[in-house]
Amino acid sequence: MTWTSGQLQREKQARPGSGAVLAFPDDKDLRVYGPAESQSAVFGDVCPLLTSLLDGYNVCVMAYGQTGSGKSYTMLGRHSDDGPVLPLDPQSDLGIIPRVAEELFRLILENTSRSPKVEVSIVEVYNNDIFDLLAKDSIAAVSGVKREVVTAKDGRTEVALLASEAVGSASKLMELVHGGLQLRAKHPTLVHADSSRSHLIITVTLTTASCSDSTADQACSATLPREQTEAGRAGRSRRASQGALAPQLVPGNPAGHAEQVQARLQLVDSAGSECVGVSGVTGLALREMACISRSLAALAGVLGALLEHRGHAPYRNSRLTHLLQDCLGGDAKLLVILCISPSQRHLAQTLQGLGFGIRARQVQRGPARKKPPSSQTEGKRRPD
């Protein structure tokens, strides 16, 4: 794989003198990480999105790629039965999620004048069913309950009866994540001894008081250090941020309470694509692979529909795409991290992943928007 004249290229020589080239357009928002790149360097390109989250924008960070290519390592870090130890060593191999947790609460503690409230929910999409990894049974044990996707009155896609917990620190957030990971479906394959068989979606919901007057505006500008604010403005790999307009404020309620803004951060560790001839799966694992393949195909189909500006995007072809409808449809700033293998054996999956990245990068859905808190847009929900 080479980076030449602003283009990412991968060539396959079928026979001498022939070849297939897959290239990304010259794009300053595209970043390529080599094998020696640190987890801290990768997080450096994610960090500006936390500025957007604190400003009230929805954000989604998604790892995509074949099984065994490093998605879970990128999002979570090296596999361990123990949770991460905070505060983090900048040179540690912990991934994006624990780094997001620590940085988010560091930024919140710098200015608490906007009364921030943080809630966390964790689900997995397994065999095209959604399971709540924070739901508890009658004896308060976390059990992973099956849930359904619903659409709220304001049009937002949500999970009915989804358990969420308020958190006040990065350690508490990661404690919940670690507990949810213990329930995540896994199955060994010839490619990966600890292969995840589900899509993991961690949603961090941040509710803050809106900057509605000059005093609040000053507080908002003080939320981040100058260099962090400038980095947020110049953040890379922001498909939805181009041409973003200043979002409208959420009206206060009749009781005179302060205006509020609710923003969601979705951290997605997708299940990996795989070839049955390479992974060697049979039985239940084969069914899992088929469901994973269908959901990833549905994801590519939605991006294709958005890219071609079709009148209808098939979000409901998969629960994964239905659940991610808000961020895929242009309501969020979306960052996709493609994880690929350098092995010639996995060339077909590598080319497929790069093709997905090209499609995702070309989708333009207009400006991201702030969303009001659910308490101000509460309405009857209907199952889809």
Swiss-Prot record:
A molecular function (GO) term: ATP hydrolysis activity
SUPFAM superfamilies named in the record: P-loop containing nucleoside triphosphate hydrolases
GO annotation, cellular component aspect: centrosome; cytoplasm; kinesin complex; microtubule
Location(s) in or outside the cell: Cytoplasm, Cytoskeleton, Microtubule organizing center, Centrosome
Domain Kinesin motor stretches: 7-363
Residues the entry annotates as binding ATP: G65, Q66, T67, G68, S69, G70, K71, S72
Region annotated Disordered, chain positions: 1-20, 217-256, 362-384
Chief location: cytoplasm
Superkingdom assignment: Eukaryota
Similarity annotation: Belongs to the TRAFAC class myosin-kinesin ATPase superfamily. Kinesin family.
Quaternary structure and partners: Homotetramer.
Protein name per UniProt: Kinesin-like protein KIF25
Species whose genome carries this gene: Homo sapiens
Gene from which the chain derives: KIF25
